[in-house]
Amino acid sequence: MLILTRRPGEALYLDDNIKITVLSVQGRQVKLGLEIPAETTVYREEVYLKIKEQNRLALENTEQDLLAATELWQKKEKK
């Protein structure tokens, strides 16, 4: 993990197209401004982790559904 220190009004760049500016610091909260390309997706961590978990569960269900469908197909062909 890269750890940086910035004061309000100071910024940093990621590659050439993402600028992150510290807008303010109040107590334990830091307000950031992000200048990013429109096609860049940004999620809060808790939302991102939930999406990843839902995708994982959907993939598991798909595998189980495919196995069940294969079994049904094989039973149907035996008749």
UniProtKB/Swiss-Prot annotation:
An example GO biological process term is: mRNA catabolic process
The protein's location, in the record's own words, is: Cytoplasm
One annotated GO molecular function is: mRNA 5'-UTR binding
Main localization of the protein described in the UniProt heading: cytoplasm
Instruction: Provide the Gene Ontology terms for cellular component.
Output: cytosol
Swiss-Prot/TrEMBL keywords: Bacterial flagellum biogenesis, Cytoplasm, Repressor, RNA-binding, Translation regulation
Which residues pair up as cystines?
A: none
One Pfam entry name: CsrA
The UniProt entry's sequence similarity note says:
Belongs to the CsrA/RsmA family.
Q: Which HAMAP family match?
A: CsrA (MF_00167)
Q: What does this protein do?
A: A translational regulator that binds mRNA to regulate translation initiation and/or mRNA stability. Usually binds in the 5'-UTR at or near the Shine-Dalgarno sequence preventing ribosome-binding, thus repressing translation. Its main target seems to be the major flagellin gene, while its function is anatagonized by FliW.
User: Quaternary structure?
Assistant: Homodimer; the beta-strands of each monomer intercalate to form a hydrophobic core, while the alpha-helices form wings that extend away from the core.
Q: Which protein, by its recorded name, is this? A: Translational regulator CsrA
Q: Which organism is it from?
A: Maridesulfovibrio salexigens (strain ATCC 14822 / DSM 2638 / NCIMB 8403 / VKM B-1763)
Recall the taxonomic lineage recorded for the source organism.
Bacteria, Pseudomonadati, Thermodesulfobacteriota, Desulfovibrionia, Desulfovibrionales
- Write the gene name: csrA
